[in-house]
Amino acid sequence: MYKSIYSLAQASFTEQKSEFIAKISPVKTEEDAVSFIESVKAENRKARHNCYAYVLSGGNLSRYSDDGEPSGTAGSPILDVIQKNGLSDVAIVVTRYFGGILLGKGGLTRAYSTAASMAVSAARIMELEPAKALTVT
């Protein structure tokens, strides 16, 4: 048994003049995840950073990116939120519009984690049971 989400959800907040916009989407394949990430980046071309994480295959495949933020301050906290909520087959992208104030490593980690958590809270979560397709002849 694992958890995923029904559909796209979004949440946002402002931290010291930087706007953080988090979007979470269900994805079935790595190609779906990359397509979702690229679409969010295209929507937010003027953003300073579009950091992401995704988990597929019941947690067997995960990827993340800090997209130019200091190492370990963005993608990893987003991935932690996905894993702590027991989610799979989801991708989260957190877009940051820089407000001119540096947040520091701790501030960035908290901000990206908060944004990702808010997106998960905004999503409708469902429980799924892995199944195999059988053909009867």
Residue ranges and their predicted role:
Residues 11-15, 122-127:
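Short, flexible, solvent-exposed loop/turn segments with mixed acidic/basic and small polar residues
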Residues 1-73:
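C-terminal regulatory domains involved in ligand/effector binding and gene-expression control
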Residues 126-137:
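Short glycine-/aliphatic-rich beta-strand segments at the starts of folded cytosolic domains
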Residues 23, 51-52, 89-92, 135:
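Structural motif
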